[in-house]
Amino acid sequence: MKAAVDLKPTLTIIKTEKVDLELFPSPDMECADVPLLTPSSKEMMSQALKATFSGFTKEQQRLGIPKDPRQWTETHVRDWVMWAVNEFSLKGVDFQKFCMNGAALCALGKDCFLELAPDFVGDILWEHLEILQKEDVKPYQVNGVNPAYPESRYTSDYFISYGIEHAQCVPPSEFSEPSFITESYQTLHPISSEELLSLKYENDYPSVILRDPLQTDTLQNDYFAIKQEVVTPDNMCMGRTSRGKLGGQDSFESIESYDSCDRLTQSWSSQSSFNSLQRVPSYDSFDSEDYPAALPNHKPKGTFKDYVRDRADLNKDKPVIPAAALAGYTGSGPIQLWQFLLELLTDKSCQSFISWTGDGWEFKLSDPDEVARRWGKRKNKPKMNYEKLSRGLRYYYDKNIIHKTAGKRYVYRFVCDLQSLLGYTPEELHAMLDVKPDADE
């Protein structure tokens, strides 16, 4: 990346290449005559960007755009993108891709956010969005006489406000590193079915989810930094709302409605983060028509097994777990990769290229290219290949959703509590699909 920076706080972008050689090397990757960024040049670029971004403050004041991007409406998002396009003379920006509110935009995560715009354009916008989010951090005391969160109010195009009853926080001193939510720690806390169902809330009500990232590097005078954004596994607070009680019980009866916001905050940190099942972004193709302005009154209960039993429109001969039905059950909107894999794994006709190994929730991609081809067809991405598919699988590793089985090629395992969500044990599914344990076992 090259940058020409004046004495004024402006930035001219000449050329860039977005390359992730460490994780996804590709022999046919286009190369350009662009010198490598050194630590000093990166710092120069960062400072130039920050100086230029400061001009957005006047635009915020002029248009009444909230400081916290998670509180932006679709109009605010559009105004922000328009400002960036004019400020940096950006080309090739498709404004239609940014038709979402601020909460959905911030929830995308870097990889998927970058897909919204051309290479260097997306990098610039993401850098600015991160800066805006960090600037909105405010401290709240959590020790002593003020153990509860103050009542928090959130607004968006579709959603209403909710108060948080309290949050139980794990003392940071028990861990040696700032990013201490390690795989081993998460594994000690298997995710419950109630938390699986909170996917519904995370997707239907993105702007009202509370995140409390109590990182050790933010500790100052017994204060923690608390931000309002979608929960990620980086936090370590177990929140609960006034009526929904979090306990490790796998009871669906305790959930009053999929479409209420009684359980907006869950133990996403000390347990596997199932909002990760939706990818960061759980909002790819976030369309307002998929998220009704009024809360539905129906109150379905039970497992996915119960859900499909009452669906006469489902073909009983084709997969046991249709991805579309599972997406509807969890409220995820567009079909996600984990749902698609479950569909293939429960379809007898797909056993030649993907199947259960017979060992619990472990499965094998016998023909990974065919799996990738079908995923690309489902998502209308004809260039999909296994390298790209595996990128999504890798994302699930540190979220304790899916793990790669060591020493076995193309073998993975669901490590989350699928049984409580689906209502099937792995043995039941194996029997229904005539799965025989692998001879290699």
From Swiss-Prot:
Modified residues (Phosphoserine): 251, 254, 267, 270, 282, 285
Function of the protein: Transcription factor. Directly controls the expression of cytokine and chemokine genes in a wide variety of different cellular contexts. May control the differentiation, survival and proliferation of lymphoid cells. May also regulate angiogenesis through regulation of expression of genes controlling endothelial cell migration and invasion.
Family that this chain belongs to: Belongs to the ETS family.
Annotated spans, Helix H5: 426-432
Residue(s) carrying Phosphothreonine: 38, 265
Stretch list, region Activation domain: 130-243
Domain PNT: 51-136
A GO CC term attached to the entry: cytoplasm
Protein name, as recorded: Protein C-ets-1
GO function terms (MF aspect): DNA binding; DNA-binding transcription activator activity, RNA polymerase II-specific; DNA-binding transcription factor activity; DNA-binding transcription factor activity, RNA polymerase II-specific; identical protein binding; nucleic acid binding; RNA polymerase II cis-regulatory region sequence-specific DNA binding; RNA polymerase II-specific DNA-binding transcription factor binding
Keyword DNA damage among UniProt keywords: no
Entry's localization field: Nucleus; Cytoplasm
Residue ranges: DNA binding: 335-415
InterPro entries recorded: Ets1_N_flank, Ets_dom, ETS_fam, Pointed_dom, SAM/pointed_sf, SAM_PNT-ETS-1, Transform_prot_C-ets, WH-like_DNA-bd_sf
Covalent link location (Glycyl lysine isopeptide (Lys-Gly) (interchain with G-Cter in SUMO)): 227
Presence of the UniProt keyword Ubl conjugation in the record: yes
Residue numbers of Phosphotyrosine PTMs: 223
This protein's encoding gene: ETS1
